[in-house]
């Protein structure tokens, strides 16, 4: 019976193959998106708040968003503060 199924089985249509490949590509792109659209504005807002209290160079603030397991997001904020001035 397996031999009969082998000869009578239909090949996948090229449309189905193309659809599967496209689904794989879309899933990969969703996983590898570099950053969400709101991240630059978030960085700017955080920088403005920090500048209210400490004079820093904008390049000293980095904001990164990391995706883990599809449903977990980690926001990492690194701020390099200037060295404290010596009090006299």
Curated annotation (Swiss-Prot):
Q: One Pfam family of this protein, by short name?
A: MinE
Keywords of this protein's UniProt record, alphabetized? Cell cycle, Cell division
Read off the InterPro entries from this record.
MinE, MinE_sf
Record keyword Lyase present: no
Keyword Plastid listed: no
A single GO BP: cell division
> What does the UniProt record say this protein does?
Prevents the cell division inhibition by proteins MinC and MinD at internal division sites while permitting inhibition at polar sites. This ensures cell division at the proper site by restricting the formation of a division septum at the midpoint of the long axis of the cell.
Q: Which family does it belong to?
A: Belongs to the MinE family.
Q: What is this protein called?
A: Cell division topological specificity factor
Species annotation: Citrobacter koseri (strain ATCC BAA-895 / CDC 4225-83 / SGSC4696)
């Amino acid at each position: 019976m397996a031999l009969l199924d082998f000869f009578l089985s239909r090949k996948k249509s090229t449309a189905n193959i193309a659809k599967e490949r496209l689904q794989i590509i879309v899933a990969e792109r969703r996983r590898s998106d570099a950053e969400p659209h709101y991240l630059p504005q978030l960085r700017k807002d955080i920088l403005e708040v920090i500048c209210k209290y400490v004079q820093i160079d904008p390049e000293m603030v980095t904001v990164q968003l990391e995706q883990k397991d599809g449903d977990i997001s980690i926001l990492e904020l690194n701020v390099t503060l200037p060295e404290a001035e010596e009090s006299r």
